[in-house]
C-alpha cells in the first residue's frame, strides 16, 4: 500500500478544470482539506492559453487561497488583474522572457501590492544565473515539466535547480508531473507540491489522506 503521508502543502492546479469548471468538485476538495489553488495564466510564451482571471471570485467564496503562476510575455498588461484580488496570496512569473532590470521592476510591483513574490524557472533554466534575485524572493516555482499544458511526465532534470534552491532562504514550489508514485522523491525538498491530473484522478479517501497535513 502506498504511503499517503506527505508533510508538505498540496496546491491543486486548476488546469484539469480548464474546459469544465466544477465548483461542486472544488467544494468537495475544500471539505477534504485542500486550501490552496495553483492558478496558471498563459499567453504566447507557451503553446497554450488558459485562465485570464476567470473564477477567482468563486475560488475566494469557497475559501481557497490562490497561488498565481504567470507563464506570460505580456506581464505589464496581465499582472494588474491579480495584484489586488483578495484571494491571491502569491504570484510567480517566469524569468525567461525578461532581462534583469525588468524582472526587478515586476518583483517590486508585486511586493508593493502586498503579495508574496516568486520567480518561476523552466528546468532548463539554471537557477544559479539568478542568484541575487532569488535571495530577494518569498519563493521560487520550479517546473518539473515543460510549461504550457497539464498531464505531462515528471522530468528529473528539475533536481539541478532544486539542489541550487536549497542554498537560498525562500520557499520552494514544484510544479509538474507529480503523482502518488513519485511524490515521495521530492516531498522532503520542497514546501509546496502542485498536483493537477495526478490529484483529480485519486480516490476520495486517497485525497483525504494526502491532505491531512493541510489541516
From Swiss-Prot:
Binding residues annotated for a divalent metal cation, in chain numbering: 38, 40, 69, 175
> Kind of enzyme, top EC level?
isomerase
Pathway(s) it belongs to: Carbohydrate degradation
What catalytic activity is recorded? D-ribulose 5-phosphate = D-xylulose 5-phosphate
Please list the disulfide bridges.
Answer: none
Cite the Gene3D superfamilies for this sequence.
Aldolase class I (3.20.20.70)
The record ties this protein, via SUPFAM superfamilies, to: Ribulose-phoshate binding barrel
Q: How is the cofactor bound?
A: Binds 1 divalent metal cation per subunit.
Enzyme Commission code(s) on record? 5.1.3.1
Q: Does the keyword Nucleotide-binding apply?
A: no
> Function of this protein?
Catalyzes the reversible epimerization of D-ribulose 5-phosphate to D-xylulose 5-phosphate.
What family does the entry list? Answer: Belongs to the ribulose-phosphate 3-epimerase family.
For this entry, the protein name equals Ribulose-phosphate 3-epimerase
Species name for this entry? Mycoplasma pneumoniae (strain ATCC 29342 / M129 / Subtype 1) (Mycoplasmoides pneumoniae)
Amino acid at each position: 500500500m502506498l504511503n499517503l503521508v506527505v508533510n508538505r502543502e498540496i496546491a491543486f492546479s486548476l488546469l484539469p478544470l480548464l474546459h469544465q469548471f466544477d465548483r461542486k468538485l472544488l467544494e468537495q476538495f475544500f471539505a477534504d482539506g485542500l486550501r490552496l489553488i495553483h492558478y496558471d495564466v498563459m499567453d504566447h510564451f507557451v503553446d497554450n492559453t488558459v485562465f485570464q482571471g476567470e473564477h477567482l471570485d468563486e475560488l475566494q467564496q469557497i475559501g481557497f487561497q490562490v497561488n498565481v503562476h504567470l507563464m506570460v510575455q505580456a506581464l505589464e498588461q496581465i499582472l494588474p488583474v491579480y495584484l489586488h484580488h483578495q484571494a491571491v496570496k502569491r504570484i510567480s512569473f517566469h524569468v525567461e522572457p525578461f532581462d534583469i532590470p525588468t524582472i526587478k521592476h515586476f518583483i517590486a510591483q508585486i511586493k508593493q501590492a502586498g503579495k508574496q513574490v516568486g520567480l518561476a524557472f523552466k528546468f532548463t533554466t539554471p537557477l544559479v544565473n539568478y542568484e541575487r534575485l532569488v535571495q530577494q524572493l518569498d519563493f521560487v516555482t520550479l517546473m518539473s515539466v515543460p510549461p504550457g499544458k497539464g498531464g505531462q511526465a515528471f522530468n528529473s532534470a528539475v533536481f539541478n535547480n532544486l539542489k541550487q534552491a536549497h542554498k537560498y532562504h525562500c520557499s520552494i514550489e514544484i510544479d509538474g508531473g507529480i503523482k502518488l508514485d513519485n511524490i515521495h522523491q521530492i516531498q522532503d525538498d520542497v514546501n509546496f507540491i502542485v498536483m493537477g491530473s495526478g490529484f483529480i484522478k485519486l480516490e476520495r479517501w486517497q485525497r483525504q489522506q494526502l491532505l491531512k497535513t493541510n489541516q
